[in-house]
């Protein structure tokens, strides 16, 4: 079976638009940002609150010669509306920056705000992916909240799919939200 990152990339690849905008709401080590930059998007925007994430991502993008169309933002994803008014593809990889302090994680309080704003900015026929990690305390809160929240989204506006390993209780999962129509 493919790894979560491969699955998310396969899904996002299907939504690439040559004049579109993609957003990585949780930059981390920059692998999703790099993937989006390598696609046919006109612009890629990536957020993280940790300067270390920006430095790692910038180095990765420079090494791969993909920095030109990417805007790296050191700010919380809950402030996305100061930088983004609309986008076609977006991804949240909730949790913590690998190989760093696991106490610094995304928080449900700010993640709720960010996802709400992202849904408002998501273009018709665009997709928003939420990668949920219930294996740590804050991640469990986020997973529980977003799985319930997704059920309440209007079906005339959104199509929603949850991809999960059924026999691994704390395995990461992907919530795929496609906008069908404006509300």
Sequence positions of predicted segments:
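S-adenosyl-L-methionine
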Residues: 1-20, 31, 55-85
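Conserved SAM-binding loop of SAM-dependent methyltransferases across substrates and taxa
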Residues: 29-41
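Conserved SAM-binding motif I beta-strand of class I
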Residues: 43-48
């Amino acid at each position: 079976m493919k790894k979560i990152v491969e699955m998310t990339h396969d899904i996002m690849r299907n939504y690439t638009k040559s004049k579109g905008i993609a957003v990585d709401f949780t930059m981390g080590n920059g692998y999703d940002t790099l993937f989006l930059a390598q696609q046919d998007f006109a612009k890629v925007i990536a957020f993280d609150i940790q300067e270390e994430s920006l430095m790692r991502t910038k180095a990765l993008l420079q090494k791969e010669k993909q920095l030109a169309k990417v805007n790296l933002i050191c700010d919380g994803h809950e402030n996305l509306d100061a930088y983004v008014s609309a986008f076609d593809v977006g991804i949240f990889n909730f949790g913590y920056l690998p190989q760093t302090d696991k106490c610094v994680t995304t928080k449900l309080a700010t993640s709720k705000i960010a996802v709400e704003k992202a849904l408002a900015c998501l273009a018709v026929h665009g997709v928003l992916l939420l990668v949920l990690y219930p294996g740590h305390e804050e991640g469990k809160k986020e997973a529980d909240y977003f799985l319930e929240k997704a059920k309440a989204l209007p079906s005339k506006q959104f199509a929603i799919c949850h991809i999960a390993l059924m026999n691994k209780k704390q395995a990461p999962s992907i919530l795929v939200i496609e906008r069908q129509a404006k509300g």
